[in-house]
């Protein structure tokens, strides 16, 4: 038996060593890696080169007079966008329903900060040239003020590298989607080659960058989602050539993305001077006089709201990445929203969801705790067997197996039911970590009978570390109710687990800590009930 335990210990150690990297990556403790076949350094790559399907032409394009550059504003119930008439690049994109802090007078979230303007978000590259700098532009129309259900279009006409360029940007009052229809035509009678690229740029989307909520460059290409958050990798650059549905910059809660309709393209991403830059470039296209083709590209500037993203084109819904156990996380988020509709508090909704999960797994947990209690009663007899046959491991294992058989105890009975619940924990972890509903959602808001702010944002850590410390105490108490490990080394390791988890959870979003704390309390109650009946 001891030999078997030694072998098991070695195997488990190997699993921990190999699996830790995957676990820490999944949990967000270390940046995710990207398959080597998808990674190419863009350091030496020229500025976004693009290829495009035949754009629209206006037979010999008529001459036009460039207009003086000025700001153009688009206002909807969801956001306020400010563009420049010289090519349609973004100057601001402020989200009306999301703010930088929990204070009532907190500024709205601005996805395009001033330092990002220099990389021309919503910019257009033509034959490698930044059209907003090298072209001449005229703007047709005025500001847009859209009410619910309305759409509006801004039209920018330009002359860039011998091509007449017409950008039509359509805005939707009920969505964060911006749709561009791009028309190209030679300014003379001869055909011209056009290479078009769409640019994007933003600063960090997570002020006070947390290891659990990093700003990263992400993309959905060739049917799979990928992302890079490592500063070193992003400063070197990312270069992807493939079938690209969308690419952009995102955090757990917000996304700025470009999504070309014809998806064969080259993606270039880079972090430079604190600004995340993305360009999606289409292949070269011959543009003939009289060409009427239209190039369509979608953009997303807004929160990662599931319903809106799932309704958007180009698989933008895949930006909400819930990891390996997404099939578990998605229904859990739905249940969380269901409870919230009735209680109006996400902290309470998390507790109700935890209770529901505990009830579902009650039979398995009951079996596990009952098996552990039987093992606890067997420990004195097992200790005597180890002492009696300390020099004869084979005989010791035989006697221990005889005891297990006599008292009908399965030594693994306490662990196996728990293992079944691990995927649910990881699924709920990802669900709570990526649920924008928890951003600035209060639980208690203030310490009782005081004005001290506490647990006013379930997406932020507990400012006074009360919940993680109490959680650590519950883990210690739960450990006291659990039979001690027979192996002294294992017992010492288990003794330090509450300390390790407490430090680990200190900076966790408080919503996650509330779940874990509530789960521990329910587990202690269940163990106490089983002990009382024993």
Swiss-Prot record:
* Gene Ontology MF terms in the entry: membrane insertase activity
- Main localisation, per the record? membrane
What is the native source organism of this protein?
Nitratidesulfovibrio vulgaris (strain ATCC 29579 / DSM 644 / CCUG 34227 / NCIMB 8303 / VKM B-1760 / Hildenborough)
> Function of this protein?
Required for the insertion and/or proper folding and/or complex formation of integral membrane proteins into the membrane. Involved in integration of membrane proteins that insert both dependently and independently of the Sec translocase complex, as well as at least some lipoproteins. Aids folding of multispanning membrane proteins.
User: What would be one Pfam family of this protein?
Assistant: 60KD_IMP
- Residues spanning the membrane: 7-27, 319-339, 342-362, 413-433, 493-513
Q: Which PANTHER family match?
A: CYTOCHROME C OXIDASE ASSEMBLY PROTEIN COX18, MITOCHONDRIAL, OXA1
Q: How does it assemble?
A: Interacts with the Sec translocase complex via SecD. Specifically interacts with transmembrane segments of nascent integral membrane proteins during membrane integration.
User: Keyword annotations for this protein?
Assistant: Cell inner membrane, Cell membrane, Chaperone, Membrane, Protein transport, Transmembrane, Transmembrane helix, Transport
Concerning its family, UniProt says:
Belongs to the OXA1/ALB3/YidC family. Type 1 subfamily.
Q: How does it sit in the membrane?
A: Multi-pass membrane protein
The GO annotation for biological process reads:
protein insertion into membrane; protein transport
For this record, an example GO cellular component is: plasma membrane
Name the NCBIfam families for this protein: yidC_nterm, yidC_oxa1_cterm
Q: Does the keyword rRNA-binding apply?
A: no
Query: What sections of the sequence does the record tag as coiled-coil?
Result: none
Which protein, by its recorded name, is this? Membrane protein insertase YidC
